[in-house]
Amino acid sequence: MSNIIVELKHVGKRYGDTQVLKDINIEIEQGKFYTLLGPSGSGKTTILRAIAGFLDVSEGEVLFDGKRINDVPANQRKVNTVFQDYALFPHLNVFDNVAFGLRLHRMSKQDIQTKVEDALKMVRLQGYADREISELSGGQQQRVAIARAIVLEPQVLLLDEPLSALDAKLRKDMQYELRELQERLGITFLFVTHDQEEALALSDEIFVMNDGEVQQSGTPVDIYDEPVNHFVADFIGESNIIQGHMIKDFLVEFNGKRFECADAGMRPNEPVEVVLRPEDLDITPANSGKVNVEVDTQLFRGDYYEIVGYDDLKNEWLIHSTNPAKDGETVGLTFDPEDIHVMRLNESEEDFDARLETYEGE
């Protein structure tokens, strides 16, 4: 039996001549934490609104529990939304904000009392029922918005950048709370953000969006370690992306040298892009590593130094090191074959997955 609760099949959305969603195909399973991740204008919030019923799609189908819901009004869908600005009613106290939807459903006073108390307990706001919204911190207001959304017991909770208005420390605290809440509730969360660190920390699965298309989907580890294209490699974390050629399976050439790698399934001498993450580079004395770079600048980031250098071919290198380097000095860089990730130019996610299965199965 399938546990897919939401599915988008060949979904497109146009505003006049502008195509904002292009052939979107995604499957969302019950009880998991999903994230739509991408820059502004990538289409992630449009997908959220299409699932919620706040807009009509131009092409394709939106399915809920296997049934087409394109024509089902928003108030009849088994989803609820937490908005970026929380959309709380300032003239109502905490209890009445959370109870608002229950009253629209004409529930009894006793049922409303019980459900509101349970929802506030779930978000750790016991004792706040009589507080005015203006008396609450940003984090507390966000919890009220979540309580109002979950009190109606939706099967899917949609969250549209709910942490964006919070300061850095509170955002991190709320990440833990959101993840814990999702696990306690056991319902599906679909979270929208442009913050890749948030997405990596929270998600069971991420859909990376750009220009109205899903560039890649997968677990945070898969997407970080195996980006399918230049956009994903550059957008998720920080990367050194260098032009090269795939000499043969498990051997790649860049910077005028050949290196063993863990990739295969490409044409001999095919042009490729090589990805090396800054944290995978170790600094050695000059001429004792695999690449020499001249240190240009460095910044202290608290638990590491962020060092920028340039090789003889003027490629920029970003290095994360626990030890500082001296501006202007030449150092060596070393890395393991498994640290090298080779990307074909313009390879689709489908072709990437097929190639990966072929050579990993050998």
Swiss-Prot record:
Residues 6-236 form the ABC transporter domain. ATP binds at residues 38-45. It comes from the Bacteria. InterPro entries: AAA+_ATPase, ABC_SmlMolc_Importer, ABC_transporter-like_ATP-bd, ABC_transporter-like_CS, Mo/tungstate-bd_C_term_dom, P-loop_NTPase, PotA_ATP-bd, Transp-assoc_OB_typ2. It is found in: Cell membrane. Its EC number is 7.6.2.11. PROSITE patterns: ABC_TRANSPORTER_1, ABC_TRANSPORTER_2, POTA. Gene3D superfamilies: 2.40.50.100, P-loop containing nucleotide triphosphate hydrolases. Keywords: ATP-binding, Cell membrane, Membrane, Nucleotide-binding, Translocase, Transport. SUPFAM superfamilies: MOP-like, P-loop containing nucleoside triphosphate hydrolases. It is a peripheral membrane protein. GO terms for cellular component: ATP-binding cassette (ABC) transporter complex. Pfam families: ABC_tran, TOBE_2. It catalyses: ATP + H2O + polyamine-[polyamine-binding protein]Side 1 = ADP + phosphate + polyamineSide 2 + [polyamine-binding protein]Side 1. Its main location: membrane. GO terms for molecular function: ABC-type putrescine transporter activity; ATP binding; ATP hydrolysis activity. The complex is composed of two ATP-binding proteins (PotA), two transmembrane proteins (PotB and PotC) and a solute-binding protein (PotD). PANTHER family: SPERMIDINE/PUTRESCINE IMPORT ATP-BINDING PROTEIN POTA (PTHR42781), SPERMIDINE_PUTRESCINE IMPORT ATP-BINDING PROTEIN POTA (PTHR42781:SF4). Belongs to the ABC transporter superfamily. Spermidine/putrescine importer (TC 3.A.1.11.1) family. Part of the ABC transporter complex PotABCD involved in spermidine/putrescine import. Responsible for energy coupling to the transport system. This is Spermidine/putrescine import ATP-binding protein PotA.
